[in-house]
């Protein structure tokens, strides 16, 4: 059972009565065949549900209205099987508030060269029916995605599936509640922002809860529940001698388990799926939540440190998008550099809170060590290295008049040396196109020091995210050149200024 089981995507066929009952019967038959095949063979993340043909303005408007009010409907996939005059779609599209994808396909893959006649031509008109639909979308400034390809093509399946993930994620985001335990780290700028504007734009709400409210729940956790969770730790991780039974840090592990159980109970009771903490506001907690946060992220919660609610929300959104995909997604911070000509590297980490979903396959190490920040007892944490391969780091920032999403494509590499004195999980990567270009572009665009790191998602996913939410995206990859990047930022300033 995943979040995608809670949603469905409606498959809508556009046509008209001009072609007669027999043509419409064949259109319906084709649509049923295509939907059944896609549900069976395409490995889509959620189910396609075929709706009645849209052959008149009233029918189309009714479908769009029903989609808006059906909580299970994540979006619409539209196929213009025949020509469907686009003025029929205006009223429906004008009220539609769910994501929209045009599947530009046709029932047959190859032309029947020897038998093709005008009946065939009239039945299979995607080539120009799709263009008519595209015009009205452009005329109405309607955000919608387009996938072109035969319905049996695996590349088309992959792209439809990726769009479905965006559609479901958008619906989940409209219900997302972000809990901030305490406020921002004092005097930090980028983690702050306009929470009202964020709720208007994305749909998620952000509210603060006193740490004392959390402490009450934490203190109510029973020893029996703690013992059961400790047993899970024992089977899942490699415990250092200090954290094992009779070890001098065993009580710190028990306290970490108490905090984890309390945090999870608090989040579940409040319906929260993302949260923040800050080391400057820990009154009543015996240690900074480290292990607890790591494990909650692995369970799908969004998180960011120092009150950074934008990154916490983005992490939850990206975890929903990547559900079931290979690779993990985590809170991350660009921490320190390795400057070496031709081999510049970034070491990413945080004080404690890196998600084990990005870890290498062997068991993480559970340890308790001193943390000089926060003034509390030594916290428990999981220590691991990260899987290698292509990845992205993404940052969502508030520019006052709009949101900007920054994405840097990176290549995660194996740590060339052991890190015996580094007591935190970490990731090592090469930034594309190179560290000087990537860091300078990131800084010029205002990117945060906190990011969401993902092996599971790629640049195309984040482009779709930006498009579906109508926000600016700034991309740093192997094609980036600083003069052109600076120009793009200037052009975006003008473009989004005109849109206000």
UniProtKB/Swiss-Prot annotation:
A GO CC annotation given for this chain: cytosol
Cofactor binding annotation: Binds 1 Mn(2+) ion per subunit.
Top-level taxon of origin: Bacteria
Keyword Manganese: yes
GO biological process, one term: L-arabinose catabolic process to xylulose 5-phosphate
Pfam families: AraA_central (PF24856), AraA_N (PF02610), Arabinose_Iso_C (PF11762)
Cofactor needs: Mn(2+)
Pathway it works in: Carbohydrate degradation; L-arabinose degradation via L-ribulose; D-xylulose 5-phosphate from L-arabinose (bacterial route): step 1/3
Binding site for Mn(2+): 306, 333, 350, 450
Catalytic activity, reaction form: beta-L-arabinopyranose = L-ribulose
GO molecular function, one term: L-arabinose isomerase activity
Enzyme Commission designation: 5.3.1.4
Keywords: Arabinose catabolism, Carbohydrate metabolism, Isomerase, Manganese, Metal-binding
Family from the record: Belongs to the arabinose isomerase family.
PANTHER family named among the record's database cross-references: L-ARABINOSE ISOMERASE
Function comment: Catalyzes the conversion of L-arabinose to L-ribulose.
Quaternary organization: Homohexamer.
NCBIfam families: PRK02929.1
Record protein name field: L-arabinose isomerase
Species of the source: Salmonella enteritidis PT4 (strain P125109)
Lineage, highest ranks first: Bacteria, Pseudomonadati, Pseudomonadota, Gammaproteobacteria, Enterobacterales
